Design a protein with these regions (language model features):
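Amphipathic alpha-helical segments of tetratricopeptide repeats
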Residues: 56-60, 96-107, 136-147, 176-186, ...
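Single-residue signature of alpha-solenoid repeat helices
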Residues: 51, 91, 131, 171, ...
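Structural motif corresponding to the intra-repeat A-B loop/turn of tetratricopeptide repeats
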Residues: 45, 65, 85, 105, ...
Length: 382
């Protein structure tokens, strides 16, 4: 009998890991450094209502025990939960109380974290000069305390404040520095934040392909690290690019629906409001103006409820444009755009007036010239 020919094994060789898999395995699970002391068992995905309940209970226990250090750290979690729930007055009281307790305990690191929380709240409220001042103090305090995490978070807050204002040249290098530091330490949550920030700068300056790639990487890292908040923001960024670059409305809406599920599970009211505003943007670009009007109206109500002036102004701009497309009187639209231009200037958003100018151009309106001050009129106004 002849010898059977040798056959290679039928099992396929192991597949090489994809670039996404390799990136994801560079990082550990996301953690929430703002949950400190006895609250370190809380996770980055803990519901904010659960954080508030646990934080308040621990704060009261620390106060009864006369432990200002623990009161400062549990108070930080309380402040952050209130802030993310849009409860501005409560958040303001909580971060200040946390700072006072940290100062009493002589804990410079806890003082830095309280300042970071206060600066982040100030940015959320549209008080950008105050945000910069508090975040700079937080970064300096963190450096003195040798706490690289709070220093990094505070510098990240400064970078985000500058980015929101449209000062891209000044903060791009800082974003990239923070991204490199986060990658080196394997910090998933901070890496995701930095990637999303740089991606947003690229998107706002028209570099859609690179923005998409960075939002995509951020989404992959966040998913692997179980960072639902970071993942939701990355999906929102991807939806924006898919809509504006590709015109793929249904895919964009699907990404936003996935992000909304995470926002609702964690009770992320601010992120949910921005999700609804983005859904309005997607529908507006698709010419579905009645639907975009409804989403902008919902987002506007949500921003009103949490005293978020930047989100409120941007949602209002979308609503004004939608109403104009649905037949509103041009004079009323023009008057609203004049008010919005002043509002965006007052908040300190450098790109705000340009957004209003583009809206006027898109809608075929001309700006209303401001009245010349008495005794100081130009030659043309005479």
């Amino acid at each position: 009998m002849s010898e059977q020919p040798h056959r290679p094994p039928t099992t396929a060789p192991p597949t090489a890991p994809s670039a996404a898999d390799r990136r994801a395995h560079m990082y550990g699970k996301a953690f929430a450094p703002e949950y400190q002391g006895e609250l370190t068992t809380l996770s980055v995905n803990s519901s904010l209502t659960d954080v508030l309940t646990a934080g308040t209970a621990q704060l009261r226990a620390a106060e009864r025990a006369g432990a200002p250090g623990e009161a400062a750290r549990s108070g930080l979690a309380v402040a952050e939960a209130h802030r993310r729930l849009g409860q501005v007055a409560e958040a303001d009281r909580a971060w200040k109380a946390s700072y006072r307790a940290a100062r009493e305990a002589g804990d410079t690191s806890a003082m830095a974290w309280a300042l970071w929380s206060g600066g982040t709240l100030a940015r959320q409220r549209g008080a950008l000069p105050l945000a910069r001042r508090l975040l700079r103090l937080a970064a300096d305090s963190g450096e003195r305390a040798g706490d690289v995490v709070v220093r990094g978070y505070s510098l990240a807050g400064l970078a985000e404040t500058g980015r929101i204002q449209g000062d891209y040249e000044a903060v791009t290098a800082l974003h990239e520095q923070l991204l490199a530091e986060a990658r080196r330490r394997g910090e998933a949550r901070h890496t995701v934040w930095a990637l999303e920030g740089i991606a947003q700068i690229h998107r706002n300056t028209g570099s859609y392909d690179s923005a998409y790639a960075m939002f995509e990487e951020a989404a992959e890292i966040a998913a692997a690290a179980e960072d639902r908040r970071g993942h939701a923001w990355a999906l929102r960024g991807l939806a924006d690019i898919v809509s504006v670059r590709d015109g793929d409305t249904e895919r964009a809406l699907g990404l936003l629906a996935e992000a909304e599920a995470s926002c609702r599970a964690m009770n992320l009211l601010g992120a949910l409001a921005y999700n609804h505003k983005m859904r309005g943007n997607v529908l507006y670009r698709a010419g579905r103006y009645a639907e975009s009007r409804e989403l902008y109206t919902r987002a506007l109500e949500e921003f009103d409820g949490m005293d978020e002036p930047r989100g409120r102004a941007l949602a209002r701009l979308g609503l004004v444009k939608s109403l104009a497309r649905l037949g509103r009187e041009p004079a009323e639209t023009a008057a609203d755009l004049d008010v919005l231009a002043e509002t965006l200037d007052r908040i300190g958003l450098r790109h705000g007036r340009e957004s209003v100018r583009r809206a006027r151009e898109e809608l075929g309106l001309t700006p209303t010239p401001p009245p010349a001050p008495a005794g100081n009129r130009t030659e043309e106004s005479r």
